[in-house]
């Protein structure tokens, strides 16, 4: 088991978050998204977006957490971004009130492949759940690519399941199917005195 921890992202993490996103997408999604789309993603553009997400979130419940691997040096190795569900979390044609208050949407949950299978994804998800619980959010949703077996397997192993919603993203005239997973945010465990 790796030595690691999760902490809130800092403004100076934005460039590293963008690098992790790009590296992970280029490995994990190479058979899902067109190669030229992955090759043309702009790391500087992504870094600016992550900087804004960290420094100017739309609400206090919008958060970016990072996973850190501790060795001789510390490395950022993954991240999770989430916030209250909005129109982006809806399926096509779904009414705007389909995801009621109290639902959080995970927009990104990535661990760089070379750091995978070391507990970072579980630590990120656990830390996020703790924050969702403290924000009073009772259900979580996440869109995953239909062809992303690793993410689906990870999330379903922790209790997530499809909620029946599906959509297809238009990525440079290629429709890429996604399905929405959901899970109840577990109540905080209380110990007996």
Where are these regions (language model features)?
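Conserved GNAT acetyl-CoA-binding A-motif
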Residues: 132-144
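Short glycine/proline-centered loop/turn elements that form peptide/ligand docking sites
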Residues: 125, 148-151, 170-174
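Acetyl-CoA-dependent GNAT
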Residues: 8-11, 22-32, 38-116, 122-127, ...
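Hydrophobic "lid"/C-terminal helical patch
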Residues: 17, 21
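Short amphipathic helical patch at the helix-1/turn junction of helix-turn-helix
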Residues: 111, 145-146
């Amino acid at each position: 088991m790796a030595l690691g921890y999760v902490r809130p992202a800092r403004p100076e993490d934005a460039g590293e978050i963008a690098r992790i996103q790009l590296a992970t997408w280029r490995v994990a999604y190479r058979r899902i998204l067109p190669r030229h789309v992955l090759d043309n993603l702009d790391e500087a553009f992504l870094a600016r977006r992550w900087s804004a997400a960290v420094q100017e979130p739309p609400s206090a419940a919008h958060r970016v957490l990072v996973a850190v691997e501790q060795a001789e040096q510390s490395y950022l190795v993954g991240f999770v971004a989430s916030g209250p569900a909005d129109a982006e979390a809806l399926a096509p044609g779904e009414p705007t009130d389909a995801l009621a208050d109290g639902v959080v949407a995970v927009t990104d949950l990535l661990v760089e492949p070379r750091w995978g299978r070391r507990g970072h994804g579980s630590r990120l998800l656990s830390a996020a759940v703790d924050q969702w619980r403290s924000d009073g959010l009772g259900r979580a949703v996440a869109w995953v690519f239909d062809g992303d077996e690793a993410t689906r397997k990870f999330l379903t192993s922790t209790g997530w399941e499809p909620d029946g919603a599906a959509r297809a993203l238009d990525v440079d005239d290629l429709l890429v199917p996604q399905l929405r997973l959901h899970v109840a945010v577990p109540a905080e465990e209380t110990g007996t005195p």
